[in-house]
Amino acid sequence: MTNQNQSQTQTTQTVEKVSSRQKKKKRVCSFCVERIYDIDYKDVNRLKKFLTERGKIMPRRTTGNCARHQRQLTRAIKRARILALLPFIVE
């Protein structure tokens, strides 16, 4: 009887593990959707969306940007930081 209970609990645990992992929706590059070919370093409001609360640049896997636009975004953020449009560190 205890063996059956143990096997039932094991199967319910595996079912819970599978159901807890849901397939995430693939993110699409927002710059490609809006047909923005060159990212401008002076557009500070758009650049702020791709920074964390600590001021770090978000990775591609979280933003959903394509490789080309992620490179342009990184360059634009770094230029904006040098020109003091964006802070290096957020307090």
From Swiss-Prot:
Binds as a heterodimer with protein bS6 to the central domain of the 16S rRNA, where it helps stabilize the platform of the 30S subunit. The gene is rpsR. This is Small ribosomal subunit protein bS18. InterPro entries: Ribosomal_bS18, Ribosomal_bS18_sf. GO terms for molecular function: small ribosomal subunit rRNA binding; structural constituent of ribosome. Belongs to the bacterial ribosomal protein bS18 family. GO terms for cellular component: cytosolic small ribosomal subunit. Residues 1-14 have a biased composition (Low complexity). GO terms for biological process: translation. PANTHER family: 30S RIBOSOMAL PROTEIN S18 (PTHR13479), SMALL RIBOSOMAL SUBUNIT PROTEIN BS18M (PTHR13479:SF40). It comes from Caldicellulosiruptor saccharolyticus (strain ATCC 43494 / DSM 8903 / Tp8T 6331).
